[in-house]
C-alpha cells in the first residue's frame, strides 16, 4: 500500500474517533463519503447481521442462522430494488424467533434471494474478510447465470462489488458493501486489489466504530431491533442531556420518555442510565 494511502487512512481514523457516540450515524455517513471520494464507490451499504439460531437449527438454514438486523444505503436505491430486498430480508421478527423467521429460510424462492456470495459470507463467519466480485472467492461465471444475479445485480446496474465483513463477536457482524454501477456507455471500471486492500485496512482498524454503530442499532444477541424513535432517544441519552430536554426535542412527554429509557436499559441488560452509557465506554 502506498504511503499516501496509509496517511489518508490514519486521518480518517482520527476523524471517526472525533465523532461523539451520539453522532455515530453521522460518522457512518462520513465514512461512506470517504469511500465514495477515495475509492470511487457509487454506493456504500452497511449491514448489521446477527446469528439468531443455535448450532443445530442453523445447520438446516440457508443463511446458517444469520439474519439481517439493520441496513443503510448511502444513496437512495430504486424503489423496485428496495421492495425486492424488503420482500425477503425485512427484519419482521424484531429479535423474536417467529414462525415467519423460520419459514423465510425454507421458502421455495430462497435460492433466488440468497445468492452464492451470501452463502459464502455466512460460511466464513467469525473472521475478518474482504472479497471482490471477480477475485475467485466464488465461481463468478456460474454466479452471473443465476436468477439472483439478474435480479440483484443486472437489473440494478451493479457492475462490481466489494464485501468487507468485521466480526464484532461470534454472533454479530458488521458488513460493508461497496458498489460500482454500470456506466451509461463503455465498460465499468472494476475494483482493484489495491482498492480492496485500502477499504479492508480502514475497516479492520476501526474496531471501536463498528461496536458503537452496532450498539446504536441494537445489533446484539437478545436486543430487539430498535425503532427509529428508540434510536433517536438513545442518541439523545448519549449526549448527556437531561431526559426532560431530550423529551422536548423529540416532542415526547417526559413520563413517556422515562418509560422508553427504562425499556432501553432492560433491552441492553442494564438497570440504570449510567450503566447504559458505560456500554459505549467498554465498561460493561
Spans of model-derived segments:
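A cross-family signal for key residues in well-ordered alpha-helices
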Residues: 200, 235, 248, 278
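Intrinsically disordered, low-complexity basic tails/linkers immediately adjacent to helix-turn-helix/homeobox/MYB/SANT
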Residues: 277-284
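Regulatory hinge/linker segments at domain boundaries
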Residues: 211-232
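Short helix-capping/turn signature of helix-turn-helix
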Residues: 237-241, 282
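Short alpha-helical "packing" element that flanks the helix-turn-helix/winged-helix DNA-binding module
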Residues: 230-237, 276
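Regulatory input/activation interfaces that engage signals or partners
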Residues: 4, 11-21, 29-172, 178-183, ...
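Recognition helix of helix-turn-helix DNA-binding domains
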Residues: 240-275
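Amphipathic alpha-helical "output/dimerization" segments
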Residues: 187-208
Amino acid at each position: 500500500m502506498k504511503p499516501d494511502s496509509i496517511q489518508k487512512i490514519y486521518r480518517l481514523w482520527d476523524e471517526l474517533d472525533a465523532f461523539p457516540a451520539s453522532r455515530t450515524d453521522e460518522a457512518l455517513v462520513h465514512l461512506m463519503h470517504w469511500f465514495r471520494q477515495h475509492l470511487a464507490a457509487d454506493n456504500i451499504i452497511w449491514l448489521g447481521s446477527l446469528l439468531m439460531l443455535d448450532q443445530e437449527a442453523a445447520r438446516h438454514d440457508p443463511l446458517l442462522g444469520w439474519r439481517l438486523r439493520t441496513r443503510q444505503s448511502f444513496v437512495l436505491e430504486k424503489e423496485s430494488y428496495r421492495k425486492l430486498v424488503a420482500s425477503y430480508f425485512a427484519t419482521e421478527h424484531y429479535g423474536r424467533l417467529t414462525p415467519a423467521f423460520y419459514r423465510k429460510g425454507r421458502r421455495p424462492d430462497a435460492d433466488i434471494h440468497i445468492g452464492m456470495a451470501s452463502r459464502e459470507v455466512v460460511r466464513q463467519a467469525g473472521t475478518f474478510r474482504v472479497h471482490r466480485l471477480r477475485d475467485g472467492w466464488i465461481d463468478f461465471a456460474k454466479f452471473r447465470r443465476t436468477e439472483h444475479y439478474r435480479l440483484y445485480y443486472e437489473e440494478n446496474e451493479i457492475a462490481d462489488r466489494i464485501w468487507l465483513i468485521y466480526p464484532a463477536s461470534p454472533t454479530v457482524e458488521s458488513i460493508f458493501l461497496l458498489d460500482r454501477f454500470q456506466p451509461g456507455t463503455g465498460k465499468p471500471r472494476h475494483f482493484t486489489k489495491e482498492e480492496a486492500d485500502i477499504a479492508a485496512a480502514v475497516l479492520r482498524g476501526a474496531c471501536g466504530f463498528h461496536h458503537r454503530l452496532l450498539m446504536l442499532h441494537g445489533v446484539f444477541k437478545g436486543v430487539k431491533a430498535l425503532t427509529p424513535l428508540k434510536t433517536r432517544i438513545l442518541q439523545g441519552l448519549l449526549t448527556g442531556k437531561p431526559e426532560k430536554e431530550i423529551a422536548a426535542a423529540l416532542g415526547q412527554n417526559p413520563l413517556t420518555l422515562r418509560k422508553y429509557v427504562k425499556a432501553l436499559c432492560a433491552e441492553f441488560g442494564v438497570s440504570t442510565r449510567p450503566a447504559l452509557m458505560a456500554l459505549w465506554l467498554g465498561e460493561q
